[in-house]
Amino acid sequence: MSQLLLKQLEEISKMKMFILENCPHCKRARAWIEEFKQENPIYQSIEIELIDEQVNSEVANQYDYYYVPALFDGNIKLHEGVASKEGIRKIFDKYLKNDI
C-alpha cells in the first residue's frame, strides 16, 4: 500500500472534533472526553483529532456543520452543537461497537 493511502486510512479511522478555542461548550465536551478516558480505558482507544476551525478553516470548510463542538467519523456527522455528557458517552459507545 502506498504511504498516501495509509495516511488516508489513518485519517478515516480517527474521529474529528471541530472546536473554537474559547467556546465554553467545546471546553466542557473536551473535559468530559478526558473524564471518560480516565474512568474507562476502553475509551482511550478512540483517537480524536481536535481541529480549531479558526486556525484550520480550510479543513473545517470541507465538513457540513455550523455549530461547535462538532464530531465526525470520516464524513459522517456524529454530533453538532451543545453537547451533553451522556450524549457524548452514547456516541463513543456506538463508535466502539462500529454501530455508526
Which stretches of residues belong to each language-model region?
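Non-catalytic, surface beta->alpha helical segment in thiol-disulfide oxidoreductase systems
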Residues: 72-100
